[in-house]
């Protein structure tokens, strides 16, 4: 395994750890909404069986399967790319964090619900988590990187 690959998986591991710690803290301490910035940002505990930003609620098993496929694809793609691994690590870490929830959170094994807790009225009541932000940053960054390399 190359140093680059080790760095990639170390970053992915750190991102998954960060995601799981924030979800644990939200689940343990958010009994009710906590307003961080009035009318702009609050912490709201929610369970989500859909994808990022509550899209596709009720299809947890499908997003679990798509997550596994994406993790395998990124793992396959990593050695074939010469670009920055940061965006791929953000993508991999975010997907892995949410796949972990679907696997190990009730009702378990592919049907689990993802813990969401970040809420802003700017997104019309959508509640999301750190992993969703990692995924969004990874997709956006990868797109910009690929566009810039052409």
From Swiss-Prot:
The chain crosses the membrane at residues 8-28, 58-78, 81-101, 126-146. GO terms for cellular component: plasma membrane. Belongs to the peptidase A8 family. It catalyses: Release of signal peptides from bacterial membrane prolipoproteins. Hydrolyzes -Xaa-Yaa-Zaa-|-(S,diacylglyceryl)Cys-, in which Xaa is hydrophobic (preferably Leu), and Yaa (Ala or Ser) and Zaa (Gly or Ala) have small, neutral side chains. This protein specifically catalyzes the removal of signal peptides from prolipoproteins. It is a multi-pass membrane protein. PANTHER family: LIPOPROTEIN SIGNAL PEPTIDASE. It comes from Tropheryma whipplei (strain Twist) (Whipple's bacillus). Its EC number is 3.4.23.36. Its main location: membrane. The lineage of its organism: Bacteria, Bacillati, Actinomycetota, Actinomycetes, Micrococcales. This is Lipoprotein signal peptidase. Pathway: Protein modification; lipoprotein biosynthesis (signal peptide cleavage). One of its GO terms (molecular function) is aspartic-type endopeptidase activity. The active site is at residues 116, 132. It comes from the Bacteria. Keywords: Aspartyl protease, Cell membrane, Hydrolase, Membrane, Protease, Transmembrane, Transmembrane helix. One of its GO terms (biological process) is proteolysis. It holds the Pfam family Peptidase_A8. Coiled coil: none annotated. It is an enzyme of class 3 (hydrolase). InterPro entries: Peptidase_A8. It is found in: Cell membrane.
């Amino acid at each position: 395994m190359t140093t680059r690959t080790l760095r990639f998986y170390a970053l992915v591991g750190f991102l998954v750890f960060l995601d799981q710690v924030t979800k644990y803290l939200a689940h343990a301490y958010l009994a009710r909404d906590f307003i961080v910035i009035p009318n702009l940002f609050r912490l709201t505990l929610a369970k989500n069986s859909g994808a990022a930003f509550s899209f596709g609620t009720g299809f947890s098993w499908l997003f679990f399967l798509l997550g596994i496929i994406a993790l395998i694809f990124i793992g396959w793609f990593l050695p074939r790319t010469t670009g920055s691994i940061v965006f791929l690590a953000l993508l991999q870490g975010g997907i892995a964090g949410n796949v972990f929830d679907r696997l190990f959170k009730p009702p378990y094994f592919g049907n689990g619900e993802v813990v969401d807790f970040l809420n802003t009225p700017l997104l019309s009541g959508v509640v999301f988590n750190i992993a969703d932000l990692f995924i969004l940053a990874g997709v956006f960054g990868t797109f910009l990187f690929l566009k810039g390399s052409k």
